[in-house]
């Protein structure tokens, strides 16, 4: 992702990029059907569904004067509303903390995008999908962690361990809760 610290007086005020590493720890009871809390690959898939919006994206604070200029350039290039080559994108989202515009690879945030800010956004996006106990995010030489109280009662499939949808059906294997 690329970003900058708008209003900051230092190197980070300039537009620059990072590769981030995100670690999500979940906590719950062991699902007797599969003898695990949650399949690791499903944690990754669940997280990636929303977090892929940050991959190769520009992240700007909502009051950054670069934002209208970037959108103007994207409009002139014909890529503001998407492009056939823009295939790595998630579903658009809008929360109190951030809004994703996947068609133009842009995430607009309320706060400056720091590692601490990313943790807040990730937790907000995933708190209803996973029982998150801890999130750690590192980007460049910066790293932060935050622990959370797990409180969700998430119905999970006894056959494959992933969360059932609102109708009590497993989206992976089709199991139906009785």
Pin down the residues of each PLM region:
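Cys/His-coordinated zinc-binding microdomains
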Residues: 161, 174
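Residues immediately within or flanking Cys/His clusters that coordinate Zn2+
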Residues: 154, 167
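Short glycine/serine/threonine-biased micro-segments
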Residues: 15, 166, 172
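Cys/His/Pro-rich metal-binding microdomains
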Residues: 158, 171
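Cys/His-rich microdomains that often coordinate metals
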Residues: 164-165, 177
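Alpha-helix C-terminal capping segments
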Residues: 126, 162-164
């Amino acid at each position: 992702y690329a970003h900058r610290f708008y209003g900051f007086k230092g190197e980070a005020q300039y537009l620059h990029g990072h590769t981030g590493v995100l670690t999500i720890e979940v906590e719950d009871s062991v699902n007797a059907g599969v003898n695990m809390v949650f399949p690791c690959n499903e944690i990754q898939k669940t997280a990636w569904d929303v977090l892929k919006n940050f991959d190769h994206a520009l992240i700007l604070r909502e009051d950054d004067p670069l934002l209208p200029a970037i959108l103007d350039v994207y409009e002139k290039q014909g890529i503001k509303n998407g492009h056939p080559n823009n295939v790595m994108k998630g579903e658009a989202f809008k929360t109190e903390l951030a809004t994703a515009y996947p068609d133009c690879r842009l995430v607009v945030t309320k706060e400056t995008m720091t590692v601490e800010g990313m943790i807040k956004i990730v937790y907000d996006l995933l708190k209803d999908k996973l029982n998150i106990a801890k999130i750690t995010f590192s980007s460049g030489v910066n790293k932060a962690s935050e622990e959370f109280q797990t409180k969700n009662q998430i119905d999970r499939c006894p056959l494959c361990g992933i969360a059932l949808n609102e109708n009590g059906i497993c989206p992976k294997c089709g199991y139906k809760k009785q």
